[in-house]
């Protein structure tokens, strides 16, 4: 899903991560949105969500999934092979945590998509953590 969003010779892009809680310790990323980027402000090293478009996509995904898929965070691209979050990325993640009503409380996720790898960061209201997601099939 996220690999298809890699940035090669263009501006950064961004969108929404949708997921569901499958246990106290596990969150599943069910799907990702198409771009929700405000194209008028996108640069090679910067992008901003179009809040109106993002909110519309969040509502559509929630309704389409019989209220099981919710906003769990955001994805964006970086023009580098092995991405790491910038100071602005961490500030943005913290702001999103503080201003959004989170359906799954106490965390928000950010996926930073580089050309060769993806960096996942989580914020729990106090600490930023790197996470390594595990990939499972739908049959388990």
Write out the residue ranges for each language-model feature.
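Conserved beta-strand-loop surface patch within small alpha/beta domains used
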Residues: 1-71, 79-140
């Amino acid at each position: 899903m996220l690999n298809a969003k890699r940035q090669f010779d263009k501006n950064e892009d961004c969108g929404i991560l949708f997921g569901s809680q499958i246990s106290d310790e596990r969150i599943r990323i069910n799907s990702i949105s198409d771009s929700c980027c405000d194209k008028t402000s996108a640069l090679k090293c910067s992008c901003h969500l179009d809040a109106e478009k993002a909110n519309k996509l969040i509502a559509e995904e929630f309704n389409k999934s019989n209220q099981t898929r919710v906003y769990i965070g955001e994805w964006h691209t970086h023009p580098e092979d092995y991405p790491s979050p910038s100071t602005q990325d961490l500030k943005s993640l913290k702001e999103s945590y503080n201003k959004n009503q989170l359906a799954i409380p106490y965390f928000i996720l950010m996926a930073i998509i580089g050309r060769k790898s993806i960096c996942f960061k989580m914020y729990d209201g106090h600490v930023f953590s790197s996470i390594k997601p595990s990939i499972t099939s739908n049959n388990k």
